[in-house]
Curated annotation (Swiss-Prot):
Protein name per the record: Vascular-related unknown protein 1
Ranges for region Disordered: 1-40
GO cellular component: cytosol; nucleus
Gene source species: Arabidopsis thaliana
Location(s), subcellular: Cytoplasm; Nucleus
UniProt feature, compositional bias: Basic and acidic residues: 13-37
Keyword Metal-binding: no
Length: 211
């Protein structure tokens, strides 16, 4: 009886001890989950923050580089525009291989001996000197020999033509003489047939002198 009363009195005095223990256990379990969750979240937050900062720095660097390139290009364009507007021309320096020999042409044009080459190029000593240099000696000898041979052939041809012409003249002369003699003989024969004799006047003169 005494024990029953003591248990009841203890329960009356401590009616919520079990609830307190359960709540404490639940609180402990929830606290551990919260601690675990907070650890993962901090790790993820750190990773995301690091990625964001890195990506932001790269974007800033790209923006700065693009801005610097843009500023440089605009400055170059503005400089070119100012030089073009001011009328300044940039000298173009060609290499020596691309000058196309203009200096030599200028020297030739400034030569006094070539001033009258349009009207009389043969009289210019420069032109005659160039012709003498440009014609090799072998070609000159060939030209001289060929001209000599051609001249001889032409001379021989002219001589043969003259001989032929002379021969033809002689032949025609002989033919004319023969024809004349034949005509005279024919005339004499006609006179003789008529009873007349042809006597030269000199014979008559001599005959009269003798008489």
């Amino acid at each position: 009886m005494m024990d029953t009363f003591s248990c009841n009195s203890y329960e009356q005095n401590h009616p919520h001890d079990d609830d307190i223990d359960i709540d404490a256990h639940d609180h402990d379990s929830h606290g551990g989950d919260h601690q675990e969750e907070s650890g993962w979240t901090t790790y993820l937050d750190d990773f995301s923050n690091q990625y964001r900062t890195t990506h932001h720095e790269e974007n800033d660097h790209q923006d700065k580089s693009s801005y610097s390139l843009l500023a440089t290009s605009t400055s170059l364009v503005s400089d070119a525009a100012t030089h073009a507007f001011s009328g300044k021309s940039f000298p173009v320096n060609f290499p020596a291989k691309l000058k196309f020999g203009r200096g030599r042409t200028k020297k030739i044009c400034e030569d006094d001996s070539l001033e009258d080459t349009a009207s009389s190029p043969v009289n210019s000593p420069k032109v005659s000197h160039f012709e003498h240099i440009q014609t090799p000696p072998r070609k000159i000898e060939d030209y001289v020999s060929s001209s000599f041979v051609m001249g001889n052939i032409r001379g021989m041809g002219d001589h043969q033509i003259q001989i032929q012409e002379g021969g033809e003249q002689k032949v025609t002369l002989m033919r004319n003489l023969i024809d004349g003699n034949n005509n005279n003989n024919n005339n004499n024969m006609d006179l003789r047939s008529r009873g007349l004799c042809v006597v030269p006047i000199s014979m008559l003169a001599n005959f009269n002198g003798r008489c």
